[in-house]
Amino acid sequence: MRILVVDNYDSFVYNLVQYLGQLGVDCEVRRNDEVDLAEVGRIDPAGVLLSPGPGTPQRAGICMPLVREYGDRWPILGVCLGHQAIGAAYGATVNRAPELLHGKTSQVHHRGDGVLAGLPDPFTATRYHSLAVVESTLPEEIEVTGRTESGVVMAMRHRSLPIEGVQFHPESVLTQGGHLLLANWLATCGYPQALDRAPALVEEVEAHRLAAFAA
């Protein structure tokens, strides 16, 4: 199975690729301004991951057009900037976040929907962002599936299409259940075997996470 990872010029992208590889899939990584919609169609991946990155969704190259063009063709997962690009593609406002957190953790409250299935409620997530999707501007077809205690949107999904976004970084060692989140998404891409690999990987990362908090 091959996943297309759209690289928004971010240093974290290969951590995501590593997690996906550990779950058993191959990744093709393309910069957001070095691939067009026609080429994405020719690649015909099992799913598309829109990576974190600097700047705004409007400056994230192919991301917003890709969501509009192919949102009904393959599962799409947006992470951080990729998450914001999904919101913006559906007309939502992305504005300065009420709290600016870079490398800090927050508790995410959720109901276990979509990629968050099986994660603790709440769970600890690592945040690197100064912008956030404004919930009140989201259209009816996009539902919020995770929030911080203060109400900042941390996860959302389309109600009928396989499109999801998370504002936090699942690939961070300080985030709980990152492998499980990605495995849930890979299952929607047609690779449920990832769910068999996830528990051992989650356990390994959790040991590192607890050690980091204890230090």
Task: Provide a role label for each language-model segment.
Residues 2-6, 10-78, 90, 190:
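Flexible gly/pro-rich beta->alpha loop and the following alpha-helix that scaffold active-site loops
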Residues 27-29, 94, 144:
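Generic structural signal for residues in well-ordered beta-strands
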